[in-house]
Amino acid sequence: MAFQKRGGRRRRKVDYIAANHIEYIDYKDTELLKRFISERGKILPRRVSGTSAKNQRRLTIAIKRARIMGLLPFVAED
């Protein structure tokens, strides 16, 4: 029997930061940063969040700064 391919076209993810014209990712803007953190407290990868490489680097730096300053948790509370 022949196997049939499943699936269709996947929708291309949009860079939220570029789409909303955010030029500076501030570590104090926790509401923005929480969009890119999983429920376990880990930083979402580019393939999941859809951010560009440049914005992913900026985002990672901002999240790490916010964690050190105590604005975001390092791990999620259970």
Swiss-Prot record:
Subunit structure, interactors included: Part of the 30S ribosomal subunit. Forms a tight heterodimer with protein bS6.
GO terms assigned for molecular function: small ribosomal subunit rRNA binding; structural constituent of ribosome
Species lineage: Bacteria, Bacillati, Bacillota, Bacilli, Lactobacillales
GO biological process: translation
Annotated Gene Ontology cellular component terms: cytosolic small ribosomal subunit
Sequence similarity: Belongs to the bacterial ribosomal protein bS18 family.
Name under which the protein is recorded: Small ribosomal subunit protein bS18
Superkingdom, natural source: Bacteria
Name of the gene this protein is made from: rpsR
Source species of the chain: Pediococcus pentosaceus (strain ATCC 25745 / CCUG 21536 / LMG 10740 / 183-1w)
Function: Binds as a heterodimer with protein bS6 to the central domain of the 16S rRNA, where it helps stabilize the platform of the 30S subunit.
Keywords: Ribonucleoprotein, Ribosomal protein, RNA-binding, rRNA-binding
